[in-house]
Amino acid sequence: MEIKQHALAGTLESSDVQIMIAPANNGISIDLISDVKKQFGKQIEATVRQVLAAYAIENADVQVIDKGALDLVIKARAIAVVERAIEAKDLNWEVL
């Protein structure tokens, strides 16, 4: 699938994550900003990549600003931002 527009999901509140996505032509680029990047950075990035793979997204610029979100919150925000960016009309229940 293709990213059609810039999109954003989440907040900068404690225990949340804000994910922004934009169209790209050079594969998937993830910029992670987090106070716990050293401990959990690989897991956060893996969760985002898992959602992108489920939607068959091959090109995207993604910025993730983590404020201590749990993995399930990160996944939910990633799904929301992709759904907005691809202008989905119906939810892809297989991804959930």
UniProtKB/Swiss-Prot annotation:
Pfam entry (one): ACP
Protein source organism: Lactococcus lactis subsp. lactis (strain IL1403) (Streptococcus lactis)
InterPro entries named in the record: CitD, Mal_deCO2ase/Cit_lyase_ACP
Family designation: Belongs to the CitD family.
Entry's Gene Ontology cellular component terms: cytoplasm
Keyword annotations from UniProtKB, A to Z: Cytoplasm, Phosphoprotein
Full protein name: Citrate lyase acyl carrier protein
NCBIfam families (alphabetical): citD, PRK13253.1
Highest taxon of source: Bacteria
